[in-house]
């Protein structure tokens, strides 16, 4: 029995050679990645079950389809899946449900994507028990299809300035929804354009002439029998995008559209029949749907980065180019140190992001329980943390995927690699659910408040995630991982204090708070990034420390060492005032050492994500490594190759050439 369970006899021998170098069981590594042996095994079982249903296979490669074909193909597969899904998965298990959708439809989006990821979670976190009894069961059974509509054409991150209104009329106990301007149109929500017949819509709630800010409403958009938009609803598709073109992101407008008072989601707030407003226990409790998505983004982005690295690492193991010592056979591209430096730090980040995501998801689940018990003390901590993570993780994921594409050379530019599609999907995360710079500044506000508490002698009030800001700095001992944490704490602490002092001094000089803040934002965002990267390192360390399987723990410890050395070098300018050049040279040498240590395990590390070829959709990243013959096969399937002479050539180019001969 091979340690790497991906080995098969028909594979490219170069890839088999790499897999035989592995020192750990890839199934056991998968158990660490996905949380347990049972969860990892269920993923494999689901993938295998899906592979046995031929109707769920793509009718042609996705890159050769236009938008309508992609949406139609996604809907066709969902209909087939709906007839089989309860025989394959436990439908009440969110993880199994998400995995089977990814397996069947890939990552380009489908009509139920936001239904599962945003609509249902919004009902779970925002609707009262009575409202859940009315709508949640129908949503889970897919009697209705919903989405989450918050972003507007003119406003996204600044929720306080949302223009769509819901005005309450006590005499009829109804809210009237209205879109007063073009910029007030809801814009971008996935599945809104053509698929959803319901939406959780976030609007500015007005009662007796007073604005109460953004609140979520359950709104029916289309007739359940005909799917025609209801009177007073303007809804449609916003057109092609950089990616996600298997989905129908849409626009939505209201013209004096009435909904019952009880359509306001009332788990945390309430409006009485007479218009009395009962406010939530915490100012940001209505943001829980956003916090939910941001809590999962680290894991989701880590998975996207992992897919790009599966492709790039496998391809680098079968692609031969140039010579080293052996002049008779070209060397594997993966043997070049530059290729390792390009890919392995991103591989470490993929693991780090996934492990960090586990922590934030656990914190979010605990927060929901606490809020139900009336305890909202953890809301500010988690809101700040997930804001920073959302920004740092999406940005670094985009960087890593682009490096993976370039590491594949010219073929990486082809849609046959599928990396460009992964990139387009991943970098969407830099702007949806909050623009990244704004997210960093939300965390920065929390850091500034924390520093101000310390300055006022109230350090005891600090949350656990920022307690290090009150600690005394020291010189790091780089002989242990804790020494790297000490170094990162010092840099993050120093930058947080530096940015806060700059902000406060500007106000002392006479600048208004707003202007002083704006003039400090570059330093503040730097503080947020350092704080977030520190948390990721600590989350990675905590996860590795709990692993029981020795071979798995050893290779992940090597990956962790690679991660901390790379991360520290990446921000070395912040370390110049307290670390010597000798220490920085040591870190650089350690980085190169761990590149060499990871090299034999690289293919097994990416195989451990256990992403099927069906989901990966990459010719370059095929499990069997038989790239070149399948690249030729893929190219021949291009619709342009259905005829030897294109109509455009016959109609325009041939006459042009004939005319030139006269």
Curated annotation (Swiss-Prot):
What residues make up the catalytic site?
A: 433
Q: Which reaction does it catalyse?
A: asc-C9-CoA + O2 = asc-DeltaC9-CoA + H2O2
Q: Please, one GO biological process term?
A: pheromone biosynthetic process
Name its cellular compartments. Peroxisome
**Motif range (Microbody targeting signal):** 660-662
Self-association state and partner proteins as the record states = Homodimer.
Pathways involved:
Lipid metabolism; peroxisomal fatty acid beta-oxidation
> So what does this one do?
Involved in the first step of peroxisomal beta-oxidation by catalyzing the desaturation of fatty acid-derived side chains of ascaroside pheromones, which regulates development and behavior. Specifically, shortens ascarosides with a 9-carbon side chain (asc-C9) and, in association with acox-1.1, may contribute to the shortening of ascarosides with a 11-carbon side chain (asc-C11). May contribute to the production of indol-3-carbonyl(IC)-ascarosides in association with acox-1.1 and acox-3.
Q: Which family does it belong to?
A: Belongs to the acyl-CoA oxidase family.
- Known cofactor(s): FAD
Gene symbol of the encoding locus: acox-1.4
Annotated substrate binding lies at 284-287, 294, 432-433
For this record, the Gene Ontology CC terms, alphabetical, are:
peroxisome
Activity regulation, free text: Activated by ATP. ATP binding leads to a conformational change that promotes FAD cofactor binding and enzyme activity. ATP binding likely occurs during acox-1.4 folding and/or dimer formation.
Q: At which positions is FAD bound? A: 148-151, 156-157, 190, 319, 339-342, 410, 435
A GO molecular-function annotation? acyl-CoA oxidase activity
Protein name (Swiss-Prot/TrEMBL): Acyl-coenzyme A oxidase acox-1.4
Report if keyword Flavoprotein is assigned.
Answer: yes
* Keyword annotations from UniProtKB, A to Z: ATP-binding, FAD, Fatty acid metabolism, Flavoprotein, Lipid metabolism, Nucleotide-binding, Oxidoreductase, Peroxisome
Give the EC number(s) under which this enzyme is classified. 1.3.3.-
Under Pfam families, the record lists: ACOX (PF01756), ACOX_C_alpha1 (PF22924), Acyl-CoA_ox_N (PF14749)
EC class name: oxidoreductase
Task: State whether keyword Lyase applies.
Answer: no
Q: Where does ATP bind?
A: 341, 391, 395, 403, 526-529, 574
